[in-house]
Amino acid sequence: MATKFLFIYLPYISAGIFTLGVLYRFWRWARTPVPLRIVTTPAPRTTVRVILRMVGDVLWFPSLFKGDKFLWLGGFFFHIFLWLVILRHLRFFLYPVPGWVVAMQTLGLYAGYLIPFPLVFLLARRLVMERNLYISILGDFFALFLIMAIAISGILLEVFFRTYVVDVKALILGLVYFQPLVPEISWLFALHFLLVMVLMVYFPFGKLMHAGGLFFSPTRNQRANWEQRFVNPWDFPVGYNPQNLFPPEKYRPAPAESREGKKE
């Protein structure tokens, strides 16, 4: 029963939480009012240049490079290795496997071997630098240790405790096509699989969600059009409030004609 729950029910539960959680965060960010232009300067003035700027932010993190080159180095290589590993794992989700996925296998394999190094760097940076340690929270360390555990268990599966790949692909394809089955899987793969599902559940509710939050950041997705008049969409005409103790007409100067009439 535990095996059935781990390999059949839990994957769908974690995938549902991941999908709904990400959509909920996007919905919250999209409905957040941004009444002012707070774009980071120098800023583009056209929509096309804004899109190009955000693509650059996603691909090579220029803002981080200007602020902290060592952090940029660790973060850049971590993200590159992570994407190569994810692309390599597409072979378990696709049948037949496309040629470009087959071509990524060797590169993704070496990326999996190297990904612990930038993770160790990012973890050491939080522990050694006093300022970073002071502002770090439990979630920061949890995410790093979780990804590290996934990477190490994956390396062990590839090098020392090899699992029959056909059974693994049968498991994944069964989940993808809603025909789940429970093949004979080693305990280490079960641990690796469980850690990935924990990451999926945690992802929408932690700082890892910055991957999608970048597209909703007003400092990056706005144009530098400060000269254009902007009207708040929630503005509405405000009527007279009888409870107002200081109505403006009480203190408004009387017209000259009315003052002269009072003198007569």
Regions found by a protein language model. Give the residues of each.
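Membrane-interface helix-loop-helix junctions at boundaries between adjacent transmembrane segments
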Residues: M1-I8, P35-I38, V101-Q105
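Long, highly hydrophobic alpha-helical transmembrane signal-anchor segments
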Residues: M1-R25, A170-L194
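Residue-identity detector for threonine
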Residues: T3, T19, T32, T40-T41, ...
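Hydrophobic alpha-helical membrane-embedded segments
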Residues: Y9-T40, I86-H89, L119, A151-I155, ...
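Membrane-interface amphipathic/juxtamembrane segments adjacent to transmembrane helices
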Residues: F26-L64, R229
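Long, contiguous internal "core" modules enriched in hydrophobic/ aromatic residues
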Residues: T46, F61-L191, V198-W226, N232-E264
